[in-house]
């Protein structure tokens, strides 16, 4: 009877003592990846050849996991494991897609054609900029108005001060004039009285 280490393909191959394939319901994936034969595009590519050298890759029933590791019989301490970077060109060659032709949908499935227009975000940005510009202009206008008002107020105050000064000066002159006028009237009256007295005396003397 074959021992578990030699036998391959059972559910305990990947999980050791536990049947992880059944436990995690991976049987369809296990069958897809492990039971099907290797595609020719992969088997002929340089990608796998660089990884395993001339070792024949067997996939499916009877495949041993240690066939991918060269000199598996030697212990890992004796071998210097070296990690090699992937060559992207070889990976592209290995996993090249076959269906590279453009896909054409029937007119019924295409739907309505979309017109090339500016995105909403662009139009929103433009609106925001326009609003900001408008707001800035309005603020500048308001600021200028306030400045003019302030200047006008200052001018008005200055004008009022000038008027008050003029009034004070003119009032002072008027008082002088009034005083001068009353003094002149008094003088005239005195002069008249003296004339009147002198004329009366003359009349009396003549009699």
From Swiss-Prot:
Keywords of this entry:
Nucleus, Transcription, Transcription regulation
Q: Which InterPro entries match?
A: Mediator_Med19_met
Compartments where found = Nucleus
Q: Which domain of life is it from?
A: Eukaryota
Any coiled-coil regions, as ranges: none
Basic residues composition bias: which ranges? 127-152, 168-179
What are its GO biological-process terms?
regulation of transcription by RNA polymerase II
Q: Where is this region: Disordered?
A: 99-207
Cellular component aspect of the GO annotation? mediator complex
Indicate, by first and last residue, each region the UniProt record lists as having compositional bias (Basic and acidic residues). 153-167
Q: Show the GO MF annotations.
A: transcription coregulator activity
What's the subunit arrangement here?
Component of the Mediator complex.
Question: According to its UniProt record, which protein family does this protein belong to?
Answer: Belongs to the plant Mediator complex subunit 19 family.
Protein function:
Component of the Mediator complex, a coactivator involved in the regulated transcription of nearly all RNA polymerase II-dependent genes. Mediator functions as a bridge to convey information from gene-specific regulatory proteins to the basal RNA polymerase II transcription machinery. The Mediator complex, having a compact conformation in its free form, is recruited to promoters by direct interactions with regulatory proteins and serves for the assembly of a functional preinitiation complex with RNA polymerase II and the general transcription factors.
Any idea what this protein is called? Answer: Probable mediator of RNA polymerase II transcription subunit 19b
């Amino acid at each position: 009877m074959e021992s578990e280490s030699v036998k391959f393909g059972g559910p305990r191959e990947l999980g050791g003592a536990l049947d992880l394939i059944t436990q995690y319901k991976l049987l369809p994936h296990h069958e897809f990846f492990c039971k099907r034969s290797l595609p020719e595009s992969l088997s002929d590519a340089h990608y796998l050849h660089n990884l395993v050298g001339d070792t024949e890759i067997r996939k499916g029933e009877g495949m041993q996991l240690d066939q991918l590791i060269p000199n598996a019989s030697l212990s890992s301490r004796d071998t210097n494991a070296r990690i090699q970077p992937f060559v992207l060109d070889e990976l592209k060659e290995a996993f090249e897609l076959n269906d590279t032709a453009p896909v054409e949908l029937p007119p019924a499935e295409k739907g309505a054609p979309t017109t090339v227009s500016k995105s909403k975000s662009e139009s929103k940005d433009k609106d925001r900029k326009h609003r900001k510009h408008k707001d800035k202009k309005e603020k500048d206008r308001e600021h200028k108005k306030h400045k003019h008002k302030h200047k006008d107020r200052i001018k008005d105050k200055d004008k009022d001060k000038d008027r008050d000064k003029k009034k004070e000066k003119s009032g002072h002159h008027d008082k002088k004039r009034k005083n001068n006028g009353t003094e002149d009237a008094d003088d005239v009256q005195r002069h008249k009285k003296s004339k009147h007295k002198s004329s009366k005396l003359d009349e009396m003397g003549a009699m």
